[in-house]
Amino acid sequence: VVGEESRLPEQVLAAIDPGGAPSRRAAASRILDWAERVVDWSEAELHVATAWQPTGAEVLRGVLDDAEWNAYHEEAHQRAAADLDALLAERSSALPRDRVRLLPGTAADALPAFANESRIDLIVMGTRGREGRVGDLLGETAETIIRQVRSSILTIPPDTHETHETEAES
């Protein structure tokens, strides 16, 4: 827990990545489950955010002309929005749209900025499971975010089944 005094969180952020493989969607659902538990226990306000950027944005921005880039960028944005909406539609609890954010950029950049600006007390996020001792506890993105936020962070490790499924999908 970050901070000088111990208190219940008032603002909780579920940082999820609902797109792509079924294992990502399952991990995002687990993160939401944990965030909802914290919110139920603490009576905090829940926010949900996902960071997105077009695949290969760094390279393609310099290669595509403006019209192609804008179309590619918009398609990626629509896909990210659809993935997020689909996951939230499966949930039994309705979340006000003003507490759901689709943040442009990488998770390592966009999530800390949003958390700090919104005065988030607790971020609930997943890990990818890196190698080594630190990797046993955190993923690279979680490590980067921890260094940039004033919030406490609850990391949810990948389900063993999800980890094997992700490796098989690669």
Predicted regions and their residues:
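Short beta-strand elements of ligand-binding domains
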Residues: 1-4, 153-157
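Glycine-rich, Arg-bearing micro-motifs that act as flexible, cationic patches
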Residues: 9, 122-148, 162
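Small/aliphatic-rich secondary-structure junction motif
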Residues: 11-70, 93, 148-149, 158-161, ...
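Hydrophobic alpha-helical membrane-association signature
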Residues: 27-31, 80, 107, 141
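General small-molecule cofactor/ligand-binding pocket signal
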Residues: 47-49, 98-103, 154
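A short acidic, glycine-rich active-site loop
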Residues: 68-82
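Structural beta-alpha unit
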Residues: 89-125, 130-132, 160-170
